[in-house]
Amino acid sequence: MGRGAGSTALGLFQILPVFLCIFPPVTSPCKILKCNSEFWAATSGSHHLGAEETPEFCTALRAYAHCTRRTARTCRGDLAYHSAVHGIDDLMVQHNCSKDGPTSQPRLRTLPPGDSQERSDSPEICHYEKSFHKHSAAPNYTHCGLFGDPHLRTFTDTFQTCKVQGAWPLIDNNYLNVQVTNTPVLPGSSATATSKLTIIFKSFQECVEQKVYQAEMDELPAAFADGSKNGGDKHGANSLKITEKVSGQHIEIQAKYIGTTIVVRQVGRYLTFAVRMPEEVVNAVEDRDSQGLYLCLRGCPLNQQIDFQTFRLAQAAEGRARRKGPSLPAPPEAFTYESATAKCREKLPVEDLYFQSCVFDLLTTGDVNFMLAAYYAFEDVKMLHSNKDKLHLYERTRALAPGNAAPSEHPWALPALWVALLSLSQCWLGLL
């Protein structure tokens, strides 16, 4: 942002979307994120807000406030909503905006001629691999993927099946944040799948502006939340780019300035996520104590893990598709163990953990799209994983006792950050 009358206000809204998007309400009908996106689209091109532009900014603020009022009934108690309302009031005061006046819908920022999407002369710092010329060794890449019921492959090639209902951080480092929201596949079931995905690319030097990407069930956009397809107006903006591979089903995001490739798919009703990222970027965190708070690095909390291998063995022994234990209700009888294995073998001939995940998902959901999710997840591994000898992962040779969760070195305590956020939410509500 430039130094203008609105620099302080716009600085606030550089931070606010990160906070709002990383910690949204769980499966809430509140539409505050839509209001945020509309406001950003209306104001993101205003690098300098002089006095002559203040009326236009006030119009955008009134439209923002009007949007929040329309969704107020469904946002009661929502931290993101109350934070936005409080921020709007502050900006109204700072810019001497009247609450009465035009509230036309925010206009989408149009890209100028010769937009940076066409630039190929990005600075070297905006190309991660080129910047490695000063190092003796090439970067070491890692992979993380989330798909299906959901199944997680971490940056360290640990494979887990998790419940993790609600909003969970997948990645959180100095360059980007990724959060998923998982919802129950069947009413009353502990089996969940990813219904929403938010990716925040943080502003980086002369390369990219902050960009937010959001996908939900039945909505896989081929653009960022502000309508753009690259990193904005900076000289190296072409180092961040979205490409649509299959309309409404498959997009790829290239973030060359951090050597990162992200693949997002919609398979059936649910989303899958896969990323290739340098270890240096994975470990780039300011607070080392909070490094373990995201799933791609440390995996799921112990109490959120499902021992699907024991479940699979139980189904094979009984010869019928039926969950064991009070926390896993009976699924539709669409597949037996034999028919599920036969179906999965059509796409996944190697009986590795992707194959076993496929069988598990068919037995627990009866939805054949979960077979495709496992298949595409493995296809993404083949494209993104740097070690071709580690594409297939297999179950442990040591069997787990029925009812035991998958092993973990340390059970998780409630992260201190979440406790702080809970306290903060109470503070906001007390002020409003």
Swiss-Prot record:
Pfam families: RGM_C (PF06534), RGM_N (PF06535). It is found in: Cell membrane. It is a lipid-anchor; GPI-anchor. Residues 1-29 form the signal peptide. Its main location: membrane. GO terms for molecular function: coreceptor activity. Residues 99-122 are annotated as: Disordered. Residues 30-149, 405-432 form a propeptide. A lipid is attached at residue 404 (GPI-anchor amidated asparagine). Autocatalytically cleaved at low pH; the two chains remain linked via two disulfide bonds. PANTHER family: REPULSIVE GUIDANCE MOLECULE A, RGM DOMAIN FAMILY MEMBER DRAG-1. Belongs to the repulsive guidance molecule (RGM) family. This is Repulsive guidance molecule A. It comes from Gallus gallus.
